[in-house]
Amino acid sequence: LAENLVPTYADIESLVVEDGKVLVKTTAEAHEIPTPPADRLGTVKADEICGYGGLLDSLSAAHHASHGVHEGALVRNGEVLAYAEDIGRHNVLDRLRGIVEDKKIDVSDVMLIFSGRVPQSVISKVHGMGVHLIASRALPSALGLKLANEYGITVVCGLRSDSFRLYTHPER
């Protein structure tokens, strides 16, 4: 799911982990699944984005204790639909993807509030989830911004409760 090779859990027939190898049997041939272009997020006000500036701090005790975990939350209209934390930023996105699939969350109008840097690998995962806006405390890479621009993903970084930087798709 996280690499966008299998559309849903239902397409996985079996999963075997043995001797350090993983074998996944699927109902369909593995291939990249195109993400539908559906984007119902519309225009987002700056105040709404800033309102999420302190969200991750309010959700994670682990971050306060260690300052060693990444976090991500999918939000819609002030409601947290999914939250994940992990020591790896990619793992956070994989966990969120699993929650989206498990709970059947429609992500066409959600924002991802994120703690990590935003390189092209993060944008690829965000695109695979079908999310159209990522707002992160950290900064993006040039390649991440290039890919986000191609995918139509709005990138907001340096997120704080009183400010942020908008990098792509200002029309949103």
Where are these regions (language model features)?
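Intrinsically disordered, low-complexity regions enriched in acidic/Ser/Thr/Pro/Gln residues
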Residues: 1-77, 82-83
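Feature captures the catalytic cores and cofactor-binding loops of soluble hydro-lyases/lyases
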Residues: 8-9, 89-169
